[in-house]
């Protein structure tokens, strides 16, 4: 099966839900007209990143009764969408979230599990951490979603791999850091190495949508990528600018790669479980 994925590497307007929604809908229509199957937006694509105490005022509920998601669900009749937003639960806790929409239905929501609160980042002051990492079924196969810092920890992609995810969708709002006279930012080079490593180690497709533009002194570098199950780069978006970058992947490559390199077949989660119990409980 072939799957045409588009990475919506956008610049968002901080706190402006309507302007960001309009951009989502316009890109969804453009991607649909081009025959795209799945359009992947970055982290907090509907709100902007440096929200701090703005978070409650831009939160949404991923359901048809929400005015923002009503329009996004309608747009998902033509192609599947992964969008970034602030989710509010029934106890009024706020989460950095991504939603997967398909054929007018909500398929899955992921709440960011790891909230960086160091250096440039202050997420733990304003958001609650998610408490689950689960793969989900789509019309194209079994996928997993992660958000930025989740991918810097080995456990979430590993759990999704064990849970059956054959395509890892990764959304981020990653600012540029570390020029040091090199041709690439240190941060972008590190992210690309990590994405390539996960694709090869887990013999999965890894699609990463990173935002671009400036916000509150941060420069988001873009450079969105797709890697195949051999760890080879399929496509990369430009650095530091908005783009809609599209590639067609062949899901049959999973069969070819895993037949040649049966890492999933030989994985021993029961060993991991036993050793984790020893480490955690003595």
Describe the residue ranges of each PLM region.
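Active-site catalytic loop in hydrolytic enzyme cores
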Residues: 62-67, 89-193, 259-263
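Extreme N-terminal starter segment of soluble prokaryotic enzymes
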Residues: 1-7
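Cys-nucleophile CN-hydrolase/nitrilase-fold catalytic domain and related Cys-dependent amidase chemistry
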Residues: 17, 26-112, 174-197, 201-204
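Short polar catalytic/cofactor-binding loops
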Residues: 9-15
């Amino acid at each position: 099966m072939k799957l045409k994925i588009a990475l919506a590497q956008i610049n968002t307007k901080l706190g402006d839900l309507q302007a960001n929604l309009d951009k989502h809908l316009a890109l969804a229509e453009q991607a649909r007209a081009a025959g795209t199957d799945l359009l992947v937006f970055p982290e907090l694509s509907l709100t902007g990143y440096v929200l701090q105490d703005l978070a409650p005022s831009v939160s949404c509920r991923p359901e048809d009764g929400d005015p923002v998601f009503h329009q996004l669900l309608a747009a998902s009749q033509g192609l599947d969408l992964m969008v970034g937003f602030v989710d509010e639960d029934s106890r009024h806790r706020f989460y950095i979230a991504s939603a997967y929409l398909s054929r007018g239905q909500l398929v899955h929501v992921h709440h960011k599990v790891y909230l960086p609160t160091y250096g440039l980042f202050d997420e733990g002051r304003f958001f609650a951490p998610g408490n689950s990492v689960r793969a989900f079924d789509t019309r194209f196969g079994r996928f997993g979603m992660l958000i930025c810092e989740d991918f810097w920890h080995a456990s979430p992609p590993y759990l999704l791999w064990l849970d059956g995810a054959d395509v890892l969708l990764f959304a981020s709002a990653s600012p540029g850091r570390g020029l040091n006279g090199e041709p690439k930012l240190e941060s972008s080079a590190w992210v690309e190495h990590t994405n390539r490593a996960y694709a090869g180690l887990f013999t999965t497709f890894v699609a990463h949508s990173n935002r671009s533009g400036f916000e509150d002194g941060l420069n988001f570098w873009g450079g969105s990528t797709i890697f195949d199950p051999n760890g080879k780069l399929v496509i990369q978006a430009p650095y530091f600018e908005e783009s809609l970058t599209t590639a067609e992947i062949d899901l049959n490559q999973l069969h070819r790669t895993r037949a040649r390199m049966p890492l999933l077949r030989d994985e021993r989660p029961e060993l991991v479980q036993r050793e984790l119990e020893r480490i955690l409980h003595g």
